[in-house]
Swiss-Prot record:
It comes from Thermotoga neapolitana (strain ATCC 49049 / DSM 4359 / NBRC 107923 / NS-E). Pfam families: Ribosomal_S20p. One of its GO terms (biological process) is translation. NCBIfam families: S20. Binds directly to 16S ribosomal RNA. This is Small ribosomal subunit protein bS20.
Amino acid sequence: MPNTKSAKKRVRVSEKRRLRNKAYKTFFKNRIKEVIKAIENGEPKEVVLELARKAQAAIDKAVSKGVIHKNQGARRKERLFKRVNEYLKSLEAAETTQE
């Protein structure tokens, strides 16, 4: 238990920040899940790219707010766009085989 006035305030502040950070983390993780779900459901190229851009923006915001480290943000974006690019290549391959 905190004894001093400043220690009590630190507890309040850290709890508030923990909840805010958790909200940012949940937000960008859900954006990533939306992209993955769109890929698994075979959504059109435009939809997947738009969702990927929104996920990228959410990750960048979390990095700028200090919720996650910039290297972790870069790694998450890289893995996300690797999946997106593989999906887009498979769509292009499917289009060429149909023609």
